[in-house]
Amino acid sequence: MFKKLIDKHKKYVYHRINKMALFATIGLLGVGLVYSAKNLYTHQDNQVSIKKSFYLNKKEVRQKLIHEIDVPRILPRLKSEEEKQAESRKKYLNATITYLTEENKKAAKHTKTKKVQKTNTKRNLDKAVSKSTNAKAVKSHEVVATAYTAFCSTGCTGKTRTGYDVSNTSYYNGKRIIAVDPEVIPLYSLVQVSYEGNSFQAYAIDTGGDIKNNRIDILMDSEQEANAFGRKNVRVSW
C-alpha cells in the first residue's frame, strides 16, 4: 500500500515538474521574441536615418553643383574678322601724314650735303695718311755694304752698340743684323737689303767707326763668310 502511494506521489511530482519546465520554456521563448523584435525595430530605425542622411547629402551636393554651373564665367571675347578690319581701317585713316614744305626740303638738302662733305673729308684724310705711310715705307738709299764678324783683331766685344749679345748668333728676332750710321738710318729700324737679285731683312742695331754716311756693315757668322761677301753696292729700304 505504501509502495502504491509512493509511486502515485512520484508520478504527480514528475508531471508537476514537467509542467513547470514547459511554462518556463514558454516564458523564455516569449522574452526572447520580445527582445529580438525590439532589436529589429532599432536596426530598421538606424537604417532609415542613414539612408535619410545619405539622400540629404546627395541633395546638397546636387544643389552645389547646380549653383556652380549657374555662376556666369567671364571669358575674353574674341574679335571677329570684321572688327579687326574695322580697327585697321581706323588706324590707317587716323595716321598722321607729313607733307614736305619748302623749309623741310631745304633742311633735308642741307643735312644731306653736310653728310656728303663729312664723308669726303674723311676719305681725303684716309688717303693722306695712306700716302704718308707709303712715302715712309718706300724710303731707300743706295749704299755700300761690307761684312764683319762678332770677334775681330781690332777688339770686337761680341756685343752690338745696343747691347745685344751676338757671340753665338748673327740674327735678331729672326732677321739679319747690320751696322749703320744712325744719322742716315735710325737704330732699331727694320730694313730691306737688296742686291744682285738677292734680298733679305735686317735690324739696324749696331754701329761702327768706319760706318759713316752711305755705308752699312752686315754681320756674318765667320770671317770666311765675311770675306766671301766682300764689298757690294746695295739698296736699303725702310
UniProtKB/Swiss-Prot annotation:
Disulfide bond positions: none
Keyword Signal: yes
Residues covered by region (Disordered): 111-132
Keyword Signal annotated: yes
Residues spanning the membrane: none
InterPro entries with a match to the protein in the record: 3D_dom, Resuscitation_pf_RpfB, RlpA-like_sf
Keywords assigned by UniProt, alphabetized: Signal
SUPFAM superfamilies the record matches: Barwin-like endoglucanases
CDD domains linked to this entry: 3D_containing_proteins
Any one GO BP annotation for this protein: peptidoglycan turnover
Superkingdom to which the source organism belongs: Bacteria
Signal peptide: 1-37
Coiled-coil segments: none
GO MF, one example: hydrolase activity, hydrolyzing O-glycosyl compounds
A single cellular component GO annotation: outer membrane
Amino acid composition bias (Basic residues), ranges on this chain: 111-121
Name this polypeptide is given: SPbeta prophage-derived uncharacterized protein YorM
Organism whose genome encodes this protein: Bacillus subtilis (strain 168)
Gene of this entry: yorM
